Amino acid sequence: YFVRLLSVPVLIATCIALLCVTNYGTNPRRYSFAAVSGLTVQESSAEELYDVCAYLINEANTLRENLPEDENGVFQLSNDVFLDADEAKSSFNSLHDTYSTLYTNGKPKPVLFSEVMSYLDISGIYCPFTFEANVNVHMNDVLIPVTMCHELSHLSGYMREDEANFIAFLACLQSDDPEFRYSGVYLASVHAMNALLTVDSDLWNRADALKSDALRRDIRSNNAYWKQYETPVSEVSDRVNDAYLKANGQENGLRSYGRMVDLLLAYYRDKLQ
């Protein structure tokens, strides 16, 4: 009887482990997106990074001009988040013709109690047990479309955060909805500018001067949103997430988010010459 009693939790644990391995466990060690996409990642100068930053900021400025705003002049999505989830899936799957490994049958799932995710400093999370791409829809609207596409990248098998960010950027560019394109370019510009600031503050100042007032409002609002959730709980969550990423083959941990910039540089290298 005791052996039979023990067999139940053992069976449950085995099933959970099997789900983790089949739905997630091997994906962090698959071929990188850079390898299968044909993009050549290489060292780049600060001037090359500036060119990408300037291009992205100018694109963001242009896209932002006619987008809806709230009463504070901050970007606001015009559609219901469930309609945006449909658009995210459509835009993501349109990448399949160019990148054959990108496709999913799933859709992003707006989370009902999203503010809890904000307290944990989480904008989205892929659940390998339910095979769901969960998205925080309490955060600023500017990040919701690109986060939806980011989580679909995980659903498609790309678990590295840097690659998922870049794939999400590509998916947003595919959309016919300017709100999606703006969201993708916004995220890319933030990552690129953060990288530029670490290598050349003068070039960063030159690029920063290009930002429109509307883009600045969105950046300030987004920063203020996350600032209010900087608590001991979010710090613990960051440490757990860092350990989680390292345990799954992302040796740079949370810093691997910054590696998206290398893919951006590779993507724009020929386009900006």
PLM regions: where:
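Cytosolic-side transmembrane helix boundary signature
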Residues: 1-12
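Active-site recognition of the HExxH zinc-binding catalytic motif
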Residues: 146-165, 169-170
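Pan-zinc metallopeptidase signature
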Residues: 215-273
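Auxiliary, metal-adjacent structural segments of Zn-dependent hydrolase domains
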Residues: 65-137, 141
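Membrane-interface segments at or immediately adjacent to transmembrane helices
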Residues: 25-93, 97
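Hydrophobic alpha-helical transmembrane segments of multi-pass integral membrane proteins
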Residues: 10-21
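Second-shell loop/turn segments in exported
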Residues: 39-46, 77-81, 134-138, 149-156, ...
